[in-house]
Amino acid sequence: LFFFDLKTGRQYRDTTLTREKFLTDTGAMQTYISNGEYGIVTLANVGHGSTVSAENLGDAAITFPETGADPVFFNRIETPILKGDSLRFDIDLFKSVYKVNVLIEGMQNIDNLEDFYFGLNNYAALNFDNKPCGGFRMYRPRLTRDPAAGTMSGSFYTPYFPSDSPISIG
């Protein structure tokens, strides 16, 4: 949770919550800030390449790990803070995060099943307008392998899933 002072353009405060705390404790974060105009940005489950700061809010990007994203939460609001105000706002799901279920069958006669993977070429990031950005990259989710059944299966989340996206099995 990031607070930006809109008058100075500087970051006022940030708070990090664990996923468990966020999902189980509705009062997980309380903070007191002085009167002023603030931009409030909330992010969760973002990749190491994500960039959020007062200087780059216009072109900040949210990236995802190569194994696919967890469900991604994001919200951005601007509000005046007055003495005695109490804020409550919900963190929304990105509209363009898709869950992809993968089941690959027919691999019973393959000796080296661990050498195979499922891959999806997709955008590397989303911007604050919830639009795909950055170059394409190969997402390789971790799949469970069952050599006896000759299958690989699992689920992962991806930020953007165009209908003509190439799927790679290598």
Q: Locations of the language-model features?
A:
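Short helix-loop capping/hinge motifs at secondary-structure junctions, enriched
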Residues: 109-111
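Structured interaction patches on ligand/partner-binding surfaces of diverse proteins
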Residues: 20-23, 47-88
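A short, Gly/Thr-enriched small/hydrophobic beta-strand-prone motif that recurs across taxa
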Residues: 92-107
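Tryptophan-paired
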Residues: 2-50, 113-170
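Catalytic micro-motifs at enzyme active sites that drive phosphoryl/nucleotidyl and oxygen chemistry
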Residues: 28, 88-90
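Short linear motifs at secondary-structure transitions and domain/linker junctions
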Residues: 15-18, 66-67, 75-80, 92-95, ...
